[in-house]
Every structure is written in C-alpha cells, then in structure tokens.
Amino acid sequence: KNLSVVTSATAASKSTIVVNGVKEGAKWYYVTAATQAALEAVTAGTAITKANWTELTANGLEITPTSGHKYIRVVDVDSADKPLAVGDAILSIGE
C-alpha cells in the first residue's frame, strides 16, 4: 500500500514531514538518502531493521536530514515491525 508523504522546508537545514491519512499500523519510521535508489528497501511481510530507521513520532515532525540527503522514505509498520504501507518523497530543506 502507498503512503502519501510530503515535505516542507522550514528552518535552515530542516524539513517538516507530513503523512497524509491515518496511521494504520503501530508506528511510522523514516529513512533519508542522497538518492532514491539508496533508500532502505522495504519488503512486505518482512520486519524492518529498526536500527536503520528513525521513528517518526508525530505527523508534521521537523527533522534535520543528513547533509546531502535529498529523499525520504516513510513506512507504516504493525506491532511486529512489518510494513503495511510505504511512501517516498523528495526532501524540501530550508536554506
């Protein structure tokens, strides 16, 4: 299932992450990367490796991505950390 993810530039080097819709699973996690191909892969039915992800604790959370990172992937996981939905977006970062 696809998540609709949008980002908005805020303060210098920061971006606000908004996931449209209601969280279906237990938690949201995100990862950023310099290219879309470099984003952490997600496989249906296989738990994510939480050490590679950061919990998105609130919708509309402001983050400070690693310098040079231009993409974000958000995953909605169940209580066993298995993906229910995933979405990618280009990071809008404040200057």
PLM regions with names:
Residues 1-6:
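Proline-enriched interdomain boundary motifs that mark the N-terminal boundary
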Residues 9-18:
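Short coil/turn motif common to extracellular beta-sandwich-like domains
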Residues 20-24:
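Short glycine/proline-centered coil/turn motifs in the loop regions
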Residues 26-30:
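Short beta-strand elements bearing conserved aromatic residues within extracellular beta-rich modules
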Residues 53, 57-69:
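Surface-exposed, short loops/turns at beta-strand junctions within beta-sandwich domains
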Residues 74-76:
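Conserved structural position at the C-terminal beta-strand
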Residues 80-95:
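Extracellular fibronectin type III
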